[in-house]
């Protein structure tokens, strides 16, 4: 590979990374603004806002951006958008269920972008309720291992309402009912255990195993959906084995 083409490739990769980082920052800022609007601008009395701010800080969002978003949401500063949360349902290739959560100030634009991403990548939209029943809303706390064992984490969160602790390789995932999320996060803090994020999420109650080709198609569809600024979260019930993930990483 020549020096020029190598530089062009590196430059392209950096542009992709920067674009994704910009989208991630925008989503984190939206989270803060919406949380402040719904529950008030004081993070001490608004756990959802507290968690949104913590997640933004851990993702290196500048403090000034965080504070301006909080103020816009709380009505202390003009300029906040009228964000709406809209959930769409559909299917990826191989019958994999997909839940798409949009946070948008333009419902028609969001619907159009979701539909285009789905149809161009082998997916199909589904009627409301036809996919959602395959998922349960849960509180999810993720934390780096940092020398901790699964038993260490379980001992800290069991009495706070945690349902299970999952080993994700480099990190742990604590699952609880959404109403117990603050208690679980607080229990970790009281035990001196730092966490990466604490938020409500959808966990599949029924999983759909996919092979390497199926996983490629599902991830391609998810990437296309997440390219939309209006798409906030995408959940699927695809069950991707460690072997398939390793094969994808090697491509």
Swiss-Prot record:
Of the GO CC terms on this record, one is: cytosol
**Highest taxon above the source species:** Bacteria
Single annotated GO MF: DNA binding
NCBIfam families, per the entry: PRK00110.1, PRK12378.1, YebC/PmpR family DNA-binding transcriptional regulator
Just give the chief location class.
cytoplasm
User: What is this protein's name?
Assistant: Probable transcriptional regulatory protein ML0475
Q: Name one GO biological process term.
A: regulation of DNA-templated transcription
Q: Which UniProt keywords apply?
A: Cytoplasm, DNA-binding, Transcription, Transcription regulation
Family annotation (InterPro entries): Integrase-like_N (IPR017856), TACO1_YebC-like_2nd/3rd_dom (IPR048300), TACO1_YebC_N (IPR049083), Transcrip_reg_TACO1-like (IPR002876), Transcrip_reg_TACO1-like_dom3 (IPR026564), YebC-like (IPR029072)
Q: Which organism is it from?
A: Mycobacterium leprae (strain TN)
Q: Which family does it belong to?
A: Belongs to the TACO1 family.
> Which compartments does it reside in?
Cytoplasm
User: Mind telling me which Gene3D superfamilies this protein's record contains?
Assistant: 1.10.10.200, 3.30.70.980
């Amino acid at each position: 590979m020549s020096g020029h083409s190598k530089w062009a490739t590196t430059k392209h990769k950096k542009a992709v990374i920067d674009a994704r980082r910009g989208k991630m920052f925008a989503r984190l800022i939206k989270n803060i603004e919406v949380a402040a609007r719904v529950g008030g601008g004081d993070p001490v009395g608004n756990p959802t806002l507290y968690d949104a701010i913590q997640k933004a800080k851990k993702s290196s969002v500048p403090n000034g951006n965080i504070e301006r978003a909080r103020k816009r949401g709380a009505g202390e500063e003009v300029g906040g958008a009228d964000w709406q949360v809209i959930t769409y349902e559909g299917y990826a290739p191989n019958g994999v269920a997909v839940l798409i959560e949009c946070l948008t100030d333009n419902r028609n634009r969001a619907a159009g972008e979701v539909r285009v991403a789905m149809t161009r990548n082998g997916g199909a939209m589904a009627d409301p309720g036809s996919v959602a029943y395959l998922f349960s809303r849960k509180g999810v706390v993720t934390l780096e291992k940092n020398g901790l064992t699964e038993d260490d984490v379980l001992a800290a969160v069991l009495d706070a309402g945690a349902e299970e602790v999952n080993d994700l390789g480099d990190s742990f995932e604590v699952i609880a009912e959404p109403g117990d999320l603050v208690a679980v996060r607080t229990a970790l803090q009281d035990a001196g255990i730092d966490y990466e994020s604490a938020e409500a999420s959808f966990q599949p109650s029924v999983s759909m195993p996919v092979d390497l080709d199926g996983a490629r198609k599902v991830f391609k569809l998810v990437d296309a959906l997440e390219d939309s600024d209006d798409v906030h979260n995408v959940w699927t019930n695809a069950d991707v084995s460690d072997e398939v993930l390793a094969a994808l990483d090697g491509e």
